[in-house]
Amino acid sequence: MYPVDLHMHTVASTHAYSTLHDYIAQARLKGIKLFAITDHGPDMADAPHYWHFVNMRIWPRLVDGVGILRGIEANIKNTDGEIDCTGPMLTSLDMIIAGFHEPVFPPQDKDTHTQAMIATIASGNVHIISHPGNPKFPIDIQAVAQAAAKHRVALEINNSSFTHSRMGSEANCRAVAAAVRDAGGMVALGSDSHTAFTLGEFTECRKVLDEVGFPEERILNVTPRRMLDFLESLGMPHIPEFADL
């Protein structure tokens, strides 16, 4: 098990069922050292108001030795790469994931999806692309992986894509992992937990990475320091409270 989980939802996204406190408790039980809360961006019908994201700055950095990253799973809105994370939200958060969600960006065609995803990657506002293997949003996987490597944006391998959501993602996720491997990019693993009990669950992700021989040194979740160094390399501020993670 890796000690870092980069994708999960709380009761602030009303189709999820756990609180921040629940995740902290599970992190302590499971040996998770750093996790990111990434509730849905405000353009989703059940998402929190943008004030929720701005006010995350009041959260403690560490609770019982567990580090908490203030994040969002923003929505890709259009082919210009716009996302629903702007203004004060950008400066209040530590980490921004973005991806396609049908209520905000209805599925179209492969070229449109690819254009939108690459524009989002190139925008400089996003650190990780969520569930790029979603079969409802086919993309040019090679082109996206090359753009992600060029702009130092990680592509996610999402454990829920193999278990609860986005059925039929397996082959695409394998292709994404192989393309990122060949392009020299990074992957981020996300449990995409909607309940704290699946925090840190990467079993299916690990199978895919093993199948394609993905290099361990390019998996962001291996240590907290690797993830934090990645964020700092993209211009995010150093977080002194995490010095000993």
Swiss-Prot record:
Metal-binding among keywords: yes
Documented EC number(s): 3.1.3.-
Cofactor note: Binds 3 Zn(2+) ions per subunit.
GO molecular function: phosphatase activity; zinc ion binding
Residues engaged in binding Zn(2+) 1: H7, H9, E73, D192
Pfam families: PHP
Residues that, per the record, bind Zn(2+) 2: H15, H40, H194
Keywords: Hydrolase, Metal-binding, Zinc
Superkingdom of origin organism: Bacteria
GO cellular component, one term: cytosol
Cofactor entry: Zn(2+)
Transmembrane segments: none
Binding locations of Zn(2+) 3: E73, H101, H131
Residue ranges of coiled coil: none
Hydrolase recorded as keyword: yes
GO aspect biological process, one term: bacterial-type flagellum-dependent swarming motility
Similarity section: Belongs to the PHP family.
Record note on quaternary structure: Homotrimer.
Matches recorded under NCBIfam families: PRK09248.1
Descriptive protein name: Probable phosphatase Ent638_1550
